[in-house]
Every structure is written in C-alpha cells, then in structure tokens.
UniProtKB/Swiss-Prot annotation:
Entry function: Required for anchoring dihydrolipoamide dehydrogenase (E3) to the dihydrolipoamide transacetylase (E2) core of the pyruvate dehydrogenase complexes of eukaryotes. This specific binding is essential for a functional PDH complex.
Localization terms from the record: Mitochondrion matrix
Note: Present with 414 molecules/cell in log phase SD medium.
Presequence range in chain numbering: 1-30
A GO cellular component annotation in the UniProt record: mitochondrial matrix
Any single biological process term in GO: pyruvate decarboxylation to acetyl-CoA
Domain Peripheral subunit-binding (PSBD) span(s) in chain numbering: 169-210
Designated name of the protein: Pyruvate dehydrogenase complex protein X component, mitochondrial
Gene giving rise to this polypeptide: PDX1
Family: Belongs to the 2-oxoacid dehydrogenase family.
Ranges for domain Lipoyl-binding: 32-108
Amino acid sequence: MLSAISKVSTLKSCTRYLTKCNYHASAKLLAVKTFSMPAMSPTMEKGGIVSWKYKVGEPFSAGDVILEVETDKSQIDVEALDDGKLAKILKDEGSKDVDVGEPIAYIADVDDDLATIKLPQEANTANAKSIEIKKPSADSTEATQQHLKKATVTPIKTVDGSQANLEQTLLPSVSLLLAENNISKQKALKEIAPSGSNGRLLKGDVLAYLGKIPQDSVNKVTEFIKKNERLDLSNIKPIQLKPKIAEQAQTKAADKPKITPVEFEEQLVFHAPASIPFDKLSESLNSFMKEAYQFSHGTPLMDTNSKYFDPIFEDLVTLSPREPRFKFSYDLMQIPKANNMQDTYGQEDIFDLLTGSDATASSVRPVEKNLPEKNEYILALNVSVNNKKFNDAEAKAKRFLDYVRELESF
C-alpha cells in the first residue's frame, strides 16, 4: 500500500514538472513561420520571384530548393533551412520589385494540419517589411521637424563642397536612420551634404542634418582624414654624413689591398741536333707549348688520387673553369757557334791578348769521335697571370713554367 502511494506521489510530481516545462501529451497547435524575401547580396534591395519549386502542402527537407529568386544581376536558387511545407504563398510566380524582408510565404511544420492551423492576419502584412519601423509619436515628429528647420536655416558647409553621388547604394546604418526619421533617399541625396569619399553619404552627415551633432565635428573629422590619407614627405631631409664617417669610409677603401699583376720572364737554354731545320724545330716547339698550356689548365691542383677528390664537384665549385688563367708568349733564337778565337775579320780575341795565350794553339781542340753535332738555342718566355679574377691563376702559371723547364734537360 505504501509503495503504491509513493508511486502515485512520484507520478504527480513528474506531471507537475513536465507541465511547468510546457511538455504535454497532446499535439500543440504551432504557429506558422513567415518566409520573407531573402537578400542574396549585400547591395540587393529588391528582387523578383521566378518560380516556386513546391506547391502549398507539399513537404520539403532542409537543403531543398524551394524557390528561384531573380536579382538585377542573376537568378539564384533559395534553399530551405529546415524541414517543413508551404502553408500559403503570398507572392506568386512572376512578382517583380519585391522589397527585401517583405513576407512572400508562410511555412508550417511537416506534421501540421493546414486545415486547422491559424494564419496571421493578411490585412496589415500585404506591404509589411521584415524590419518593423516604429511610428513616431507626436512629440518625436515635432522634435524632428524642429531639427529639420534648424538644419535648413543654418547653412551646411562641407570641407570640399562636394555633392552626393546619386547612384550610390546607401549604407545600412544610413538607410535605417533615414527610415526612422521619414526621410526618403532622393531627398537625402539632394539636401544632405556628404563627407565620404566620392560623394558617399555617411551616418554622421545624417546626424548633422538632423541637428543631433554639430556640423563642425563632421568637418573636423573629414579634414583630419583627408589630411592624413597621404603621407607627407615634405619635412623629411636626407641625412648628411659626418666628416669623420666619410674619412673612415675613404680610409677603409684605401686600406683594401690592391692586387698587382704577376708576370714571369725566363730564358731557357736547350740543345737540338744540328740536322733538324729551324722551321721544323719551331713547329715542334709550338706544339709542345700548347700541350703545356692545356696540361696546366686541365689538370686539377688537388691530388687526383685522394679519396676526397671528385671531378664533378671540383668543376662546380671552380669559378669559370673554362676561362684561361694566364697568357704566354715566347721567342726562339739560335746561339751562334764559336769555331775559333778569331772573329770573322781575322782578328784575335781581346781576352787572348790580355791573358797572353796563343790563339793558334788554343783554337785547336780535340774533337771526340762518334758525337753528333748539336745546335744551342735560347727560349725567351713571358707569362702574364690573370690573378685579379682567379685565385688559382698563379699556381697554374707556375705549373706551366715547370712543364716548359723540362726542355733544359735536352
């Protein structure tokens, strides 16, 4: 018995709680939702209805396209935000110049019965807007008229005397303020002086026109913006270097070591068989010099047998590996033979006279047999090093000289 009583008391308390939270066992008669003309762009003010995709009473789901709206630029599909069905269509297909926010249909829930559902009164909603504008009272209308009189009496002075752009789209804050004070757009563009760029009407201009703020404050703000919209560089002067800094810069430039060009000059003496003509010897020497030049440039300075040597890497890190590091020039001359101590005119040598030696005796020299006769030549070599551009030029020039010095062994 006690358990039954406790169950009943618990059930009553739960019922009171559910009733308090507006939970009922019977279906609730829900009011329909007003579907207004959507704004498909920030600048859209009016639009048209191309077609309705659903008829009255046909259910639709969230995301379905319920109608197609026409703007001044294109035609856009409008999707449903929630599940529901059309209870009544206020604007039929083909309607033009429908203001944004104006009711165009009523939407009910999917489970609602359209026969028993109550629709809002249509007498006052035919030309209603989504934004309800409060009717001004008698006191407020008198106050606005007084402000307008004051505004018309006091001349409006703008900073640049510009006129409002008649083709501009008013900002939402400006449109709302004009609607609250029963001022049309055409009247505002004609009578209110703009302070925005390119003749744009701002909220401060409307407030100054209504007398809610002084016109001087608007002019001051406009002057400040126009004064600082461009960077003033007239007061900027170039910094002049102090004489000490200039002297230090000159001394640093003078302290830089100047690279002097390097030149090598050598005279090499070598022998060649007398049977070889001079022209043939010159041709062979020219080939030898070219070979030495190619060897000095082509062979790397680093030890090629080292495990750290890589020809591809050396070719990449070397500055302009194909450009010459030095230039050379040479002159080949034959040294004439001295067969006797007398000159070509039959006179004795001055050194023989001073030493008292017999010229006839000294002129006869033993000639060894089986020795081929050789001519003596002198090679005057000049090497100009391009060390101002390449740091390895001098080393390769010295390698070239070492290669040519091998002629002295002959």
